[in-house]
Amino acid sequence: VEELKEHAKNVRRNILRAVYSGQSGHPGGSLSSADVLTYLYFEVMDIHAENVKGIDRDRFVLSKGHITPGLYGVLAEKGFLSEADIETFRHFGSKLQGHPNMNYIDAVDMSTGSLGQGVSCAVGMALANKLDGNAHRIYALLGDGECQEGEVWEAAMAAAHYGLDNLTWMVDCNHLQIDGRVEDVMNVYPLDKKFEGFGFEVIKACGHDFD
C-alpha cells in the first residue's frame, strides 16, 4: 500500500507539472482520478513495456477524455512517457494532446473526447476479445457527469446483452462537471441502482483508499 501511495503522489506531481506547463487542462478531474489510475496501472492491469504494442494484454479506455493530465501522469510514472514529455502537454506539435490520441502514444488504447463514446468503444473491445478468445480484460473510466449522455446507457445495455464479464467500468463520482454540480445540472444519482438495473455487478468504494 505504501508503494501505491508513493506512485500516486508522483502521479499527482506529474498532473500539476503538465497543467502548469500547458497553462491549461483539467486538473480537478485528473486529481480525483489519480488514485484509481495508479491502482489500475500498478496493481491490476497486465500492461508493461514488453507487451504494450501487442494485443496480448489488458486495455484501458479513458472515456472522460478531458482528464489527460491524469492519464499522462500515470503513464509517465509507469515509464511509458518521460518527464520531458510531461513538460510538453498541450504544446504545439506535442504528442501529449488535450485529449488522448492513440496514434501518438503506444499505451493509449483509444482516442476519446466526446463523452459517452469511450465506454461504447470499450464495449466493442470487450466483445472483440470474447469473439477472439482473448482472456484479457477491458477497463474504462468515466465520469458521473458523463452519465448524462444517452450513449453511456446504450453501451451499458449492450454490455449486459452480450454478457461482457471481461469488462469493468469505473465511475469517478466527484459530483462536478464544467457547468456546476452534477446534481444541479442533471441529476444522475443513484448510479449504483441504475447500473444494477442494466445488469451490472456494482461495487461502491472510496476512490482514494487503497485498502
Stretch-by-stretch model annotation:
Residues 15-18, 30-161:
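Cofactor-binding active-site loop characterized by glycine-rich and histidine/acidic residues
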Residues 8-24, 172-174:
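N-terminal capping segment at the start of a domain
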Residues 19-23, 75, 199-202:
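Short amphipathic alpha-helical interaction patches enriched in hydrophobic/aromatic residues
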Residues 5, 91-103, 121, 125-127, ...:
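Thiamine diphosphate
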Residues 24, 59, 143, 179, ...:
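Conserved short-loop catalytic and cofactor-binding motifs
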Residues 1-3:
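Non-catalytic, mobile gating and regulatory segments of ester bond hydrolases
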